[in-house]
Amino acid sequence: MFARLARANYLKNSGRYFSTEPTLKERLVQIIPGKIEQVKQLKTEHGDKIIGTCTVAQAYGGMRSVKSLVTETSSLDPEEGIRFRGLTIPECQEKLPKAPGGAEPLPEGILWLLLTGEVPTESQVKTLSKDLAKRAGLPKHVTSMIKAFPEQMHPMSQLAAAILALQGESKFVKAYNDGVKKDKYWESTLEDSLDVIAKLPEVAALIYQNTYKKSDITHKIDENLDWSANFNRMLGYTSKDFDELMRLYLTIHTDHEGGNVSAHTTHLVGSALSDSYLSLSAGMCGLAGPLHGLANQEVLSWTMKLQEKLGNKEVSNEVLSEAIWEGLNAGRVVPGFGHAVLRKTDPRYTCQREFALKHLPQDPLFKLVSQIYEVVPDILTKHGKTKNPYPNVDAHSGCLLQYYGLKEHNFYTVLFGVSRAIGVLSSLVWDRILGHPIERPKSVTTEWISSYVNSDQSKK
């Protein structure tokens, strides 16, 4: 009897709420030995096997498609799109737990999935959600710093700086300084990662309120609300449909394998044993670039300018095509189309389109986005300068956020960053679990390449 009472008390105090199912950390403890053994066997028995090569064009072309990174959390197929631990987006929408009465997956569920490779139960997601709520809350120096930022400072710069300012909270740094064993690095990295994921919605919401509303956050974290709903309330939004959109948005933007700039940067910085805060802040600086996360705000700006150019009215496909050709012939691109890896329509675009068809089918901006989807692939194919003429995730997200009243385009990448933290930090935890070493590829000069390609060695 006393053992049962002690167990119940432990569950309550640890955020388990009397659930008999394993917590996230307990499940990882169960999974880790088998995974470590699998990797050890692969390195021992097949360590000399070649899994990829690098051409001169790839060396000068951003190392595109060079197989040189190991990422456990997701994989990207050129034809099929992203799979999160083997699950497609439609499968995640079907299998991951949802909010009561909701239809979209909870981001807490994909956090569990990315970390464990398993679909969590509703109880496990609820427990994780409450745990994140308990971890939320910002130190005074961070809130003061955000409120002191100048209005013209880009929200992504504010986000990266705020994450750095939280670094004094790092449990990994303390454990490392206390001499923790290497095989236990992952535990404090997990703690740091959950802490920063829990705090990011408040960081982002404070940036939003301070920059655009000249206000403060009035909502206090409610343990009975999920991570996305609490985020929306802190932003100042109460629409249940917008809650659903935010759950979808924060789920589908979490991860896109390990080679993209934000994921690779987080991994690279983390490989030096930098903690979750330092690593994520660096990743967010990469996400802020126009060729990465900043693209979503650029797409919406382009679409709205096009809408204005067309007279804010519906036009024929022929008229729309002429306007798009005019831009292409002037040397401008069509933002939101094409992808470094994908060769089909991005499934992240498709699920957002399905959401819009259900919730805002008559919205003028959505109708224009749909019409662009109809005409642009054929135009880009004829233009002949892109390998993938189909829309990516950025082509749709802006019009959905705009519809629900979140119209500050410069803030959109911050939402992307809040979501992407889930994926890149899950990967960082696994980097620690598997003991990945510091990343140190070999670089060569143009002179070396010129000499090599003309040598006998290159002809072997």
Curated annotation (Swiss-Prot):
The keyword Cell membrane does not apply. It is an enzyme of class 2 (transferase). It is found in: Mitochondrion matrix. Its EC number is 2.3.3.16. NCBIfam families: cit_synth_euk (TIGR01793), PRK09569.1 (NF007128). Belongs to the citrate synthase family. This is Citrate synthase, mitochondrial. It comes from Dictyostelium discoideum (Social amoeba). The lineage of its organism: Eukaryota, Amoebozoa, Evosea, Eumycetozoa, Dictyostelia. The gene is cs.
